[in-house]
């Protein structure tokens, strides 16, 4: 008999987030920042330490699939030449994910980004407790703290083995990106048009084409 405690924990954590006014407000602000970056053709950098790093890679790929310049940054390698071309005058957005919000590698990255790209806005998505949140708030390089109020039990049930928190990170990012394209300035048709251009072959191309024909009629 399969034990569904993990699924129940995920649902409970998502519901806690959904029912928290502050968390929902923060996700809305993040969505608006993503929307403005897309409208301004900015590069959106996404990073995370450990397992959230894989969530960051996935969401950078999601942005690319809808013709947005989404780039994953390995925070550990950023200070060793991996930041790529430097455009001091071009605004950009850096979104970092850390459950505690206290990953030192991220703070080093924030410092580099602000030095090399002064117009880059830095966002920290975290599930910090109050003590951890004090450290996040003390960082002057962070422009916006997307604090999510939830207490995931993780795979082990004691908050140790990352699993539930990664689902929360994915939910936050997907909601924010989807919300950006639900806005009047962009719209779902715009997202589908971008998806159509980035998928010139395969079954998805025909599905998107049919959907666009339906939406336009």
Give, region by region, the residue ranges found by the protein language model.
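Internal, active-site/partner-interface "lid" segment
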Residues: 151-157, 179-216
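A ubiquitous structural signal for well-ordered alpha-helices
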Residues: 10-13, 17, 30-33, 59, ...
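Short, glycine-rich nucleotide/cofactor-binding loops
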Residues: 15-25, 94-103
């Amino acid at each position: 008999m399969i034990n569904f405690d993990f699924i129940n924990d995920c649902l409970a954590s998502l519901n806690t987030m959904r029912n928290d006014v502050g968390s929902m407000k923060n996700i809305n602000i993040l969505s608006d920042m993503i929307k403005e970056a897309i409208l301004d053709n900015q590069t959106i950098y996404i990073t995370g330490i450990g397992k959230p790093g894989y969530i960051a890679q996935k969401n950078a790929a999601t942005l690319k699939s809808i013709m947005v310049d989404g780039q994953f940054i390995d925070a550990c390698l950023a200070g060793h030449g991996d930041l790529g071309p430097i455009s001091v005058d071009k605004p950009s957005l850096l979104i970092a994910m850390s459950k505690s919000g206290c990953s030192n590698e991220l703070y080093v990255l924030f410092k580099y980004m602000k030095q090399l790209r002064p117009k880059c806005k830095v966002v920290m998505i975290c599930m910090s407790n109050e003590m951890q949140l004090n450290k996040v708030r003390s960082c002057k390089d962070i422009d916006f703290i997307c604090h999510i109020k939830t207490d995931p039990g993780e795979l082990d049930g004691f908050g140790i083995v990352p699993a539930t928190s990664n689902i929360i990170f994915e939910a936050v990012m997907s909601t924010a990106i989807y919300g950006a394209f639900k806005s009047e300035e962009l719209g779902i048709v715009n997202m589908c048009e971008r998806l159509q251009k980035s998928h010139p072959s395969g079954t998805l191309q025909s599905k998107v084409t049919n959907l666009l024909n339906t939406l336009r009629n």
